[in-house]
Amino acid sequence: MIPLFRRLFPSHKADLIEALDEALHRFVEKPGTIVDLRSRVFPYIDLIAINLDGGIVDSSPPPMAPAEGETGRAFECANINVSGRRLSVGGVPLDLRMEMRDVVCDWGHDANQDAVLILRSAREGQLVISASQLVLEESIVRIVGAKARLYGIELERLRLAMRARGRRSLAADISVQAKKFFARAKIDIYVQLDITNEYVVKISQLKCKGDGKLGSFVCTTLQPAFQRALEKSFSLRSIPLLSEIQLRDIHVAVADTVDLTVYFGSA
């Protein structure tokens, strides 16, 4: 579902392009036009292309109100393609690609009587999210290093090694060499991430072990953040374009890049 932040649902091609572009710009910081739409006979659409390349997304977007009351058929679209190369999500660069075929879209309104676009069904499609292990390692150094410096701790070295534990599970070993004044410590962090049968992504294990007083201090300091992370989860159904679509399968693969692939559709 995509909130359009307007009272009336678009009734022709130009209005729909404008509404979609304005709506997506509320969630993605990016200059220029995001949406391209091709249609020979509206409301039958040949292609909706969404270009998020180089955009910036808040890691905690505001929750979206569901549609309430009456809904109806808005249009049908042969293909919806989304490209998100070097898309920054919470400061972490990712590559995102999504393809949907034979999509049926409905109109509706939320509790504020603003129009919403509901992607009701798709015959088939897939979403692929990728990130290189090296880029993830650099992001951890940048983000965690900034927080560590608040405690007077410098990260001298950090190494990330990820591996798949199965089709829906992956593990990460993070080895850190830290320094505070003249004290040094080696800190090992283990993270396990699992995806449930309900397509909910959750950190199931998060452990820290450090040597010496500095290592113990770091692990103790991290415990509240670890506990908050263990309590959080992310449903793939909360992704606006997938909230109403039938999800079929998902798997993770790890090599030089970490790839998450979601298969969906009624086919």
Task: Describe each PLM feature range.
Residues 1-267:
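Extracellular/lumenal and peripheral-membrane lipid-interaction modules
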